[in-house]
From Swiss-Prot:
Residues 67-375 form the IF rod domain. Residues 255-375 are annotated as: Coil 2B. The modification Omega-N-methylarginine is found at residues 11, 21. GO terms for biological process: astrocyte development; Bergmann glial cell differentiation; D-aspartate import across plasma membrane; extracellular matrix organization; gene expression; intermediate filament organization; intermediate filament-based process; intracellular protein transport. Gene3D superfamilies: 1.20.5.170, Single helix bin (1.20.5.500), Vasodilator-stimulated phosphoprotein (1.20.5.1160). GFAP, a class-III intermediate filament, is a cell-specific marker that, during the development of the central nervous system, distinguishes astrocytes from other glial cells. Interacts with SYNM. Residues 1-31 are annotated as: Disordered. Residues 9-18 have a biased composition (Polar residues). Residues 376-430 are annotated as: Tail. This is Glial fibrillary acidic protein.
Length: 430
């Protein structure tokens, strides 16, 4: 039964050894502690005393019973270790498959997703930059047109102010001409009144003289001829009338000339005033048209500025959303990297556990082989013992592979003394 258990344990170890393979960073595991079988079989002398055979047989039976119990316990532990190794191998395979899947698919897929989204984001950013540049060019053109229209409006305003100033001057000249005409009319009226007054005075003087002549009836008889007073008065009257007529004619001629001059000036001023009013109306219409154009351009400019602000705000929002998306993707990538690192760490830990279990299994196998060899050796040859020391050293050959060196050290002892020692090295690549 013990042999069957050992054979089944060997078979289980062989099957598990063929299944256990892994990849991961190397780690120096050191050497396995030296194993000694001196505690199980005490050294025997070279010559056997047959008188002590019974005692030796009794001691051997007790030793065999204790060794059998110890082997059963070790066998049970070995079976539990094998079950644990199988369970860990299954987990190792699942983790290795998941790791290979992550290595094969996730980075490439994630990189493709990143590249596609980055290309889309760059394309949209280029479009937004182009639209922004186009809107800036349109805004600059509209600003230039607005400056030109403002300059034209300023020129037209200056012309309107100049026309208003000329109109004010013309109005002042017309007022002055009106005042001059009124003054001349007043002077003509005063001259007519003066002529009437002088005529009345002259008539009164003539009447007084006639009355005086009628009252005085002086008859002077002289040798000379009598003077003709009526002729003298008539002559005086004629002279006064001639003077008055000439004065009136001169006054009328001067009044007519002045009135004609004032009429010409007034007509010219009226024509200039009419032209100024016409020009003012034209300027007013042009000013209204330019004001309407300016208002429309202001509305267009405000609309374009509003659209530009909306575009900038939308661009800022989209940029913020893209930045958030990039940050989120980077966080997801970082979390995936951390998860991958965690899986790798777990895989490394499981690999270390597996290597430790492999070492322990190898140790138990060596113990079992030594036990089988000791069982097959006759009693009289118990003085020759072989102790093997196994050490494992793992060195990194390349990434993803482990190189395991198994050193088997054989020591032959007789009477507690080392008489022969040999060492064998086996290389195993995992």
């Amino acid at each position: 039964m013990e042999r069957r258990r050992i054979t089944s344990a060997r078979r289980s170890y062989a099957s598990s050894e063929t299944m256990v393979r892994g990849h991961g960073p190397t780690r120096h595991l050191g050497t396995i502690p030296r194993l000694s079988l001196s505690r199980m079989t005490p050294p025997l002398p070279a010559r056997v005393d047959f008188s002590l055979a019974g005692a030796l047989n009794a001691g051997f039976k007790e030793t065999r019973a204790s060794e059998r119990a110890e082997m059963m316990e070790l066998n049970d532990r070995f079976a539990s270790y094998i079950e644990k190794v199988r369970f860990l191998e299954q987990q190792n395979k699942a983790l290795a498959a998941e790791l290979n899947q992550l290595r094969a698919k996730e980075p490439t897929k994630l990189a493709d997703v990143y590249q596609a989204e980055l290309r889309e984001l760059r394309l949209r950013l280029d479009q937004l930059t182009t639209n922004s540049a186009r809107l800036e060019v349109e805004r600059d053109n509209l600003t230039q047109d607005l400056g030109t229209l403002r300059q034209k409006l300023q020129d037209e305003t200056n012309l309107r102010l100049e026309a208003e100033n000329n109109l004010a001057v013309y109005r002042q000249e017309a007022d002055e001409a009106t005042l001059a005409r009124v003054d001349l009319e007043r002077k003509v009226e005063s001259l007519e009144e003066e002529i009437q007054f002088l005529r009345k005075i002259h008539e009164e003087e003539v009447r007084e003289l006639q009355e005086q002549l009628a009252q005085q009836q002086v008859h002077v008889e002289m040798d000379v001829a009598k003077p003709d007073l009526t002729a003298a008065l008539r002559e005086i009257r004629t002279q006064y009338e001639a003077v008055a007529t000439s004065n009136m004619q001169e006054t009328e001629e001067w009044y007519r000339s002045k009135f004609a001059d004032l009429t010409d000036v007034a007509s010219r001023n009226a024509e200039l005033l009419r032209q100024a009013k016409h020009e003012a109306n034209d300027y007013r219409r042009q000013l209204q048209a330019l004001t309407c154009d300016l208002e429309s351009l202001r509305g267009t400019n405000e609309s374009l500025e509003r659209q530009m602000r909306e575009q900038e705000e939308r661009h800022a929002r989209e940029s913020a959303s893209y930045q958030e998306a990039l940050a989120r993707l980077e966080e997801e990538g970082q979390s995936l990297k951390e998860e991958m690192a965690r899986h790798l760490q777990e895989y490394q830990d499981l690999l270390n556990v597996k290597l430790a279990l492999d070492i322990e299994i190898a140790t138990y196998r060596k113990l079992l082989e030594g036990e089988e060899n000791r069982i097959t050796i006759p009693v009289q040859t118990f003085s020759n013992l072989q102790i093997r020391e196994t050490s494992l050293d793992t060195k990194s050959v390349s990434e993803g592979h482990l190189k395991r060196n198994i050193v088997v050290k054989t020591v032959e002892m007789r009477d507690g003394e080392v008489i022969k020692e040999s060492k064998q090295e086996h290389k195993d690549v995992m």
